[in-house]
Amino acid sequence: YVFAKNANVKMPKRYLACQEGLYTNKNNDVVNFDEAVAYISDLGDCFAKPSIGTDSGNGCGVYCLVGGIDKLSGKTCREVLSGLGENFVLQERIKCHESIRKIYAGSVNTFRIMTYRWHDSIVSAPVIMRIGRGGTSWTMPTQVECL
């Protein structure tokens, strides 16, 4: 995240991260659990995902954090954070362009562009489009009344 940010690569805003139980805010400052809870209490629409061992949307979730409560589940921010475990990132929720959502609206569909070095140049492999599918451990809400 830090390298991409410094290289001006467009990425979702990172609100909070946790690695092995160590919380860091958007400025990469270390914060304790209570500070993390207070920090996220009014984020609004956001997305959390595991930072270790994730695949196909497993362990991911959409939240609407307002007034210390997740409006989607009714859980407190303290309960939400406790449930995310010790390795996760909480970030801005992104949405696909309408033309890509038409393919499958239940996930964020992405293009994967792989590059490699060949002799003295950088070459790109054929572009792959990753399309979500049903059956993961969470369902993306289609209508979120957040804030």
Language model region names:
Residues 1-39, 54:
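Conserved N-proximal alpha/beta basic substrate-recognition cap immediately N-terminal to
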Residues 10, 46, 56, 107-109:
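Short, basic and Ser/Thr-rich N-terminal targeting/leader segments
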Residues 16-19, 51-53, 93, 118:
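An acidic- and aromatic-residue-enriched active-site/binding cleft used to recognize and process polar
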Residues 22-27, 57-62, 99-104:
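Short, solvent-exposed polar/charged micro-motifs at secondary-structure junctions
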Residues 40, 52-54, 104-108:
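A short catalytic or substrate-binding loop motif that flags glycine-/basic-rich loops and adjacent residues
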Residues 44, 68-147:
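Phosphate-binding site of ATP-dependent enzymes
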